[in-house]
Amino acid sequence: MIDKYLDRVVQQLDEKVGRLQEAVGGGAAKDFSEYQKMCGEVQGLLTARLYITDLRKALENSDE
């Protein structure tokens, strides 16, 4: 049951990362500081995604 919620969160993270990557690649950052902020946001979202993936694996292993 929790899998569908975790899947939805991962999907939302992936969508946000994709939008940020497109923005960075498209030159949306006005200056280097904004570029760094956007890259940091991508890094943070990917870290959160990794934590969720690890949590899912731990939950699957606890069921066994």
Question: Where are the regions a protein language model picked out?
Answer:
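Short intrinsically disordered terminal tails
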Residues: 1, 57-64
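N-terminal acidic leader/helix
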Residues: 1-27
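Short, charge-rich amphipathic interface segments used for partner binding and complex assembly
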Residues: 29-60
